[in-house]
Amino acid sequence: MNLEERLAGAVRHYWQTRLKQKETQGSVTGVQDYGARADVTGGKHMDGFASLICDLIAESGIGAECIHKGSRSDLPGYFRPAKDWDLVVVADKRLLALMEFKSQAGPSYGNNCNNRVEEALGNATDLWTAFRENTFGDSKAPWAGYLMLLEDAAGSTSPVRVAEPHFKIRPEFRDSNYEKTRKSVSYAKRYELFCRKLVLERLYSSACLIMSDRESGLLGKFTEPSADLRFTDFVASLTGKATEYKKAKELEGH
């Protein structure tokens, strides 16, 4: 099975899990959420991506005992005691890599998009400040990855009206008809710009943006809106870090 097929499996798992959670949520407690919240309160919808990345890291030569998620993925911070990352790689007491897997489906794109931006920026600031302060022992700068799966829908791909009471938004955030409509780019385009800037500003080593609609997504269908945010490049960057570690270990004589 090639990488694209394996990624399709993770996308399919995401949508199938959301659908199952929406159907069963509240069946045990009797408390029923409504709307999109019912899709996600059960968690685990991004587990397919986490499992795929774990497998790819192991295939690159890093022992499974070095790859951690769940209760063993916490790392100390600088502005807070600890942060539970979605996946962490620690080998020979050195922090090699860490990842965040995020998703967003409609209908509430606005507040959720802003929350995702603030969360990622805060996590990165906390991580690199902790690294600067030698919180992770003898570790060299770790590889930090950010993966976003966004629902491909009218709400995420249409221009958005934006308030400008004092100053205009930056040019890259303006829709092509901005001068007439005073609308910003879509949330999909915002996420594309955001992921690109995370890497440009060296807050994350690599970022990936995947889009999928909830109907064809059940079959594993997806698109990648930007060539520089593709999953293949994301994986290549990560496995490159693993190769770098293995070569360094060989030179150390281990």
Feature map (PLM): residue ranges:
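Charged, low-complexity C-terminal accessory regions
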Residues: 1-25, 29, 175-254
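Interdomain/boundary linker segments immediately adjacent to catalytic/signaling cores
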Residues: 1-69, 75, 254
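Short helix/strand-bridging catalytic loops that position acidic/His residues to coordinate divalent metals
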Residues: 74, 102-115
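Active-site beta-strand-loop-beta-strand hairpin of nuclease catalytic cores
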Residues: 81, 88-98
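Glycine-rich, often proline-containing surface loops adjacent to acidic residues and nearby aromatics
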Residues: 95-106, 145
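Acidic, metal/cofactor-coordinating or nucleic-acid-engaging core segments within structured domains
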Residues: 110-216, 220, 224
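Charged, often glycine-rich, active-site loop that binds/positions anionic groups
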Residues: 71-87
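Short N-terminal secondary-structure initiator segments
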Residues: 28-50, 97, 140-159
